[in-house]
Amino acid sequence: TGSGLIALFLKKNSNNCVIHAWDNSEKALRIAKKNAKKNYLDINFNNVDILKKHDHTIKFDIIVSNPPYVHKKEKNLISNVVLKNEPSEAIFVNSDDDLLFYKTIINFSKSHLKQKGIIYFECHKETINQVKNLLIINKFTDIEIKKDSFGINRMIKANSYGDA
């Protein structure tokens, strides 16, 4: 969840929905909770490491993920504002597998995304097509890639029809 920006935006613009925001950083969760309180928004924040096995039974209508996707060699391309306000583990992929978070979240969605649910990812421009292929392999449909404000392919949306 990082600073909570995505969760706050979704809650503010979808008042009657329940938002569950997860992060494995206590620091990030403290910041996100503070931001939610400042904006009078009721959000369920939980310390969850998606890469570890857990026994959550919640089924979601929508899963939104902005996992770490920047390579450490690209650190000089990241603005100082981002580097000062986000923990490095929220920004940089710390694995030899650039798709580790995407694979894990797609696998998680098989048992936690409702039939006809939607999944959204923010992606690195160099791996967005690989993420699209993972979604296709896992039987997601209606896959759309969207550009960010700089015209770079950055977001991907896909529908789940169950039994992936």
Model-derived regions: residue spans:
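Flexible, glycine-/basic-rich loop-and-beta segments that form/coincide
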Residues: Y161-A164
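Mobile active-site "lid"/loop adjacent to the S-adenosyl-L-methionine
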Residues: Y69-F101
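Residue-level signal for beta-strand positions within conserved beta-sheet cores that form or flank
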Residues: N15, L41, I78, K139-T141, ...
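Class I S-adenosylmethionine-dependent transferase superfamily signal
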Residues: L10, V82, I105-S109
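Alpha/beta-hydrolase-fold catalytic nucleophile elbow
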Residues: N66, N85, E122
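Conserved Class I SAM-dependent methyltransferase catalytic core
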Residues: S95-N159
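Conserved SAM/SAH cofactor-binding pocket of Class I
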Residues: T1-K75
